[in-house]
């Protein structure tokens, strides 16, 4: 039984970390209520990056560090590329929000550790904001598109996590799709099951 200051605590776990955990602000709670869940490096190597800053998270998620406990795991890093048609149709189907052909995907907010919790989607028929971890994962996953992982390709209906970045794919000046690069599998709060095996 785990306790904190003499009281039994709630515990959370997930499959695989990207090299960083997050805290309960991911689910809209406060760290004051759950001070024992903290955002920190999984493997003890602090890269000196502020992962709530988009450019610094971009550097983090596109890199790999052999000291990370989950480094050898399949979903430590993953990426997928969806055409404008695929991502737009999948987004409308998953969210019930039709913004038309998606033109831009912008992360508006990341919580401690780097997980995205608010994403603005702009299309040729309007824009909308997706503002929860589970909704973001559902909105951009696609079971019909290959996802590249550390051990080959697979497919997921939902994104493995929101520890990810969105980039436009173009041919010349024409937008043809979006690449999603991410890491980890699960919400990222508490204990990584794969890291616990180390």
Language model features with spans:
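Conserved, single-site charged/polar hotspot
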Residues: 1-198
């Amino acid at each position: 039984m785990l306790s904190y200051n003499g009281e039994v605590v709630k515990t959370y776990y997930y499959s695989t970390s990207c090299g960083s955990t997050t805290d309960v602000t991911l689910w809209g709670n406060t760290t004051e209520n759950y001070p024992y869940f903290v955002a920190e490096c999984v493997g003890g190597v602090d890269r000196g990056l502020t992962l709530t800053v988009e450019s610094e998270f971009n550097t983090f998620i596109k890199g790999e560090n052999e000291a990370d406990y989950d480094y050898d795991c399949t979903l430590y890093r993953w990426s997928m590329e969806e055409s404008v048609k695929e991502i737009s149709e999948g987004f409308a189907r998953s969210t019930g929000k039709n913004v038309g052909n998606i033109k831009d995907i912008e992360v508006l907010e990341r919580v401690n550790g780097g997980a995205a919790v608010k994403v603005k989607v702009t299309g040729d028929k309007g824009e909308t904001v997706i503002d929860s971890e589970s909704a973001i994962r559902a909105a951009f996953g696609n079971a019909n598109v290959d996802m590249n992982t550390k051990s080959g390709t697979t497919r997921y209906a939902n994104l493995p996590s929101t520890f990810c970045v969105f980039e436009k794919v173009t041919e010349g000046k024409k937008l043809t799709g979006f690449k999603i690069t991410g890491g980890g599998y699960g919400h990222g709060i508490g204990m990584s099951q794969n890291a616990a095996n180390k």
